[in-house]
Amino acid sequence: MFTVFQNHQLFNCAPSKGVFVPYTHVIPDPRFKESLPPPSYGQDFGPMESPVVPGFCPPHSTVENVISIGGRNKGIQGHQNSCYLDATLFSMFTFTSVFDSLLYRPRAASDISRYDEVQTCLKEEIVNPLRKSLFVRADRVMKLRTLLDSLSDVKGLTDQEKDPEEFLSSLLTQVMKVEPFLELSSGQTAHHYQLIVEKDPNIIVPTVQDLFDQSFATGTGTSRVKLRRAPSVLILQMPR
């Protein structure tokens, strides 16, 4: 029997033994599962190596042209709605050391029991490889996501799309217990500042500085928000 599909002969078989079905309707035959080689670590994420890098790695030098650091096998490999988290980690650590206290602060008595495990994963499996080779495989980041998901009250970090502030709340506030970067005149403290502004009809495309100034200019007298001191780190949540 000649089996033909769209005028092309694909294979020969006995009569009534050949059938075409959508690939979504087939599954691997479990009888042959034992003959398959065991999967290697990281196999599902491609052949690109992403080794653990212990020790100290300085931030990657700044570049004039971002195209030189873009392209295939550059940055953090995405997996299961990780884009928000990948972009946040890349911007926090690749070219700057302002967040390096997370990597080197010794565990205190008030820290969680798995503090060292989270810190080592962040430093040796994500930050150092980023700074050294500008690539981190998704399974390395998934390890951190799994830790944060189990150690904080922010759930769904392993597969759901979140806002960056939810990730920062899990990592900075709940797990690593980083001192707040901002202290406001109201007495509130925070790790990031949300820019709340009204649209200015006189500005077509506002800069970050425009939005920042306008946000702090909102209100009068005691209701106007001010910074008590210049923050060591300023993370801004932009208006949408």
Task: State where each predicted segment sits.
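UBL (ubiquitin/ubiquitin-like) substrate-recognition surfaces
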Residues: M1-R240
